[in-house]
From Swiss-Prot:
InterPro entries: Lag1/Lac1-like (IPR016439), TLC-dom (IPR006634). Pfam families: TRAM_LAG1_CLN8 (PF03798). It is found in: Endoplasmic reticulum membrane. It is a multi-pass membrane protein. The chain crosses the membrane at residues 12-32, 77-97, 124-144, 149-169, 208-228, 253-273. The keyword Endoplasmic reticulum applies. It comes from the Eukaryota. GO terms for biological process: ceramide biosynthetic process. One of its GO terms (cellular component) is endoplasmic reticulum. Keywords: Endoplasmic reticulum, Lipid biosynthesis, Lipid metabolism, Membrane, Transmembrane, Transmembrane helix. This is ASC1-like protein 2.
Length: 303
């Protein structure tokens, strides 16, 4: 007997048992990073960072740190790119990809919060939750300890909690788009760091410019004026207030508070980015180390 095919379009209500996939994805991502670190990133870092005729002294602290930073950014770039492609491949054919009203209605007579979730959309959520679960342990035992260690740890823990809550409370359609618009800009941030460590200043500058522009367009324009507008206004007439007298309003207010908090964070980090960008351009003509070296790493807390 062969393995039955996976029905990616199969719909079901979110269940707590679905979270069993999170540790599996966390272990999977750990294994993938370990293999890439050992057989790809290490070799790539030595080849790109150090000249062929330059003797690489791994005993020096600076050399080891630079390679570790390169490998961390390379891994994050790979993850965010894969997460972005996965989210887009799953959502771009859905009616709610182009019409935010369809976050809350359909298919058929389904109306939020009584909406089932396709198996492939569940995959997007479990993949993201698995990454942030893995990141909690990687931050503690694997990655370089930075000055923002505490903030990063809180960020990863809260990310897992918020992804889980939004899944159970059936905000998965909105959440998948929020994940996609945030992961997109992070790809260019990590690419800029890799380029900086490798000495490709022009590519680093271009990557950071795209990162800043995509941040502004996706997080400061599309996110508040389309996503938050929908979660604040479009959903209201769709909710059956008699059937969901308590849980409907509770979910509405709790998650809109969280989503607007995310907007505040996006604005805060944008102001920091803008100031640093202007300062670096005026002083050096290009973005320097302190913007992309790892001391600048804006957080993303998904809904």
């Amino acid at each position: 007997m062969g393995v039955p095919p996976v029905d990616w379009e199969a719909e079901s209500y979110p269940a707590y048992s679905d979270f069993a996939a999170i540790p599996l994805f966390a272990v999977f991502l750990f294994a993938v990073r370990y293999l890439l670190d050992r057989f790809v990133f290490e070799w790539l870092a030595r080849r790109l960072i150090f000249e062929k005729d330059e003797k690489l002294d791994l005993a020096t602290h600076a050399g080891r740190i630079k390679i570790r930073k390169f490998k961390e950014s390379a891994w994050k770039c790979i993850y965010f790119l894969s997460a972005e492609l996965l989210a887009l491949s799953v959502t771009y054919k859905e009616s709610w990809f182009t019409s935010t009203k369809n976050f809350w209605v359909g298919p058929g007579d389904q109306v939020w919060p009584d909406q089932r979730i396709k198996f492939k959309l569940k995959l997007v959520y479990m993949y993201a939750a698995g990454f942030y679960t893995y990141s909690i342990f990687a931050l503690q035992f694997w990655e370089i300890k930075r000055s923002d260690f505490g903030i990063s740890m809180v960020h990863h823990v809260v990310s897992v909690i918020l992804i889980a809550l939004s899944y159970i409370f059936r905000f998965a359609r909105v959440g998948s788009i929020v994940l996609a618009i945030h992961d997109a800009s992070d790809v260019f941030l990590e690419l800029g760091k890799i380029s900086k460590y490798s000495g490709y200043q022009l590519l680093a500058d271009v990557s950071f410019l795209i990162f800043v522009c995509s941040w502004a367009v996706l997080r400061l324009i599309y996110y508040p004026f389309w996503i938050l507008w929908s979660t604040s206004y479009e959903v209201v007439p769709m909710l059956d207030k008699k059937k969901h007298k308590f849980d409907g309003p509770l979910h509405y207010y709790v998650f809109n508070c969280l989503l607007f908090s995310l907007l505040v964070l996006n604005i805060y980090w944008w102001v920091l980015m803008y100031r640093m960008l202007v300062e670096q351009i005026l002083s050096k003509g290009h973005v320097g180390d302190d913007v992309r070296s790892g001391r600048f790493s804006p957080p993303f807390i998904p809904p």
